[in-house]
Amino acid sequence: DPPPVHDTDGNELRADANYYVLPANRAHGGGLTMAPGHGRRCPLFVSQEADGQRDGLPVRIAPHGGAPSDKIIRLSTDVRISFRAYTTCVQSTEWHIDSELVSGRRHVITGPVRDPSPSGRENAFRIEKYSGAEVHEYKLMACGDSCQDLGVFRDLKGGAWFLGATEPYHVVVFKKAPPA
């Protein structure tokens, strides 16, 4: 099996626990959350808290496809990610990569998949070790038809920071959240 992913306390990430996804460098903002974007109230985009003191919303990470008995989240394996929160959109909070280019980029959004691909892998993500890391630092990848690094970028209007397929990738750590 590939090695497990670890949280900021050095414990293995588990599919039955909640985590905050934080930037490895807190000077670069806070944790991941949901926000409306590009003039639309719904669906909600995966975005980053501007304030480095804010942890964002907790996520649940689970193996993609079926329910394997292994509850440990491992590097380089397909996972599904969803926020553990309620929204005014009354839609799923599971992440997927949007097929539509918004401001020239593919965003990670929540809610229903608008234009499913034949592979149906819009909600497949991977956690990879950050190459320069001595500690438990990682990068996220969207792995639909092919894997793409995920980074944060700013709305053209200078508003929120969104997560999507872009360079440079966003280096993250996982901090265990209290049970919901």
From Swiss-Prot:
One of its GO terms (molecular function) is alpha-amylase inhibitor activity. SUPFAM superfamilies: STI-like. Disulfide bonds join C42-C89, C143-C147. Keywords: Alpha-amylase inhibitor, Disulfide bond, Protease inhibitor, Serine protease inhibitor. Belongs to the protease inhibitor I3 (leguminous Kunitz-type inhibitor) family. Inhibitor of endogenous alpha-amylase (wheat also produces an exogenous inhibitor which inactivates alpha-amylase from animal and insect origin). This inhibitor can also inhibit subtilisin. This is Endogenous alpha-amylase/subtilisin inhibitor. It comes from Triticum aestivum (Wheat).
